[in-house]
Amino acid sequence: MLFATLEHILTHISFSTISIVITIHLITLLVRELGGLRDSSEKGMIVTFFSITGFLVSRWASSGHFPLSNLYESLISLSWALYILHTIPKIQNSKNDLSTITTPSTILTQGFATSGLLTEMHQSTILVPALQSQWLMMHVSMMLLSYATLLGGPPLSAAILIIRFRNNFHFFSKKKKNVLNKTFLFSDIKYFYAKRSALKRTSVPSFPNYYKYQLTERLDSWSYRVISLGFTLLTGGILGGAVWANEAWGAYWNWDPKETWAFITWTIFAIYLHSRTHPNWKGTNSALIASIGFLIIWICYFGINLLGIGLHSYGSFTLTPK
């Protein structure tokens, strides 16, 4: 009873704190003069991290096993892993572009975990026989960490696509406008004003374009590093799961829905990493592949749990009747 009460308190503290954090982020985006509030949001993230950590320790102590046996526990652990990902740029003293992804991702996963949909999983239960193995912590934790990193990297690639799409859209808009000017002889009328500002345009660098270039390069670098880490963790998790499957079911691979989608996910991100080595594919094409991988990883992690089919259906749930 004590552990259950402690877990309930810590869960709601973390959710309340992270709700305040996301509110502060929205305020600082809308009102730039209040940029000093960002320090408060970082303190809130620290409080959230320790609350989630306390919950996981309490659940581990009360259940006697690593808290990754169902969807509720995995979502809480995913929030914890996303915060770890959030702190990586701070350790390296670099610009934290990842926070734009990890902060909302944390509140979404934490919000869903504490919603009424997973009430049946809030109480700790005894592990099913197939999960009573020393491989539980190694395999499931590595897979969960890979999900967290692979959910953090691809959105940065998607941001690159959006920035470049907007640039191309403006380019074609200007090109169409130039055609109209030539057709209706508007270019002669604007010649005087264009000539007068020609010196400024040639001598002063295009700061917005230079900023966009720096931003896309930084996003591309972070996306590549995060996805590379996630791919490594995913590979280790799949290999560990294969060994565990052989012990539990007598076969290394069963083409279970979860295993199939894990293989598809691994293949997509392997193609992404390979595309980075090809000059013609590096950039927009590789970013598109990473964006596709983002959708695939959600199906692999969350979709199979919703369906509740196959050998990996321990984390599935049913809606609680009202």
Curated annotation (Swiss-Prot):
GO terms for biological process: cytochrome complex assembly. Pfam families: Cytochrom_C_asm (PF01578). The keyword Transmembrane applies. It is found in: Plastid, Chloroplast thylakoid membrane. GO terms for cellular component: chloroplast thylakoid membrane. HAMAP family: CytC_CcsA. Belongs to the CcmF/CycK/Ccl1/NrfE/CcsA family. This is Cytochrome c biogenesis protein CcsA. It comes from Triticum aestivum (Wheat). The lineage of its organism: Eukaryota, Viridiplantae, Streptophyta, Embryophyta, Tracheophyta.
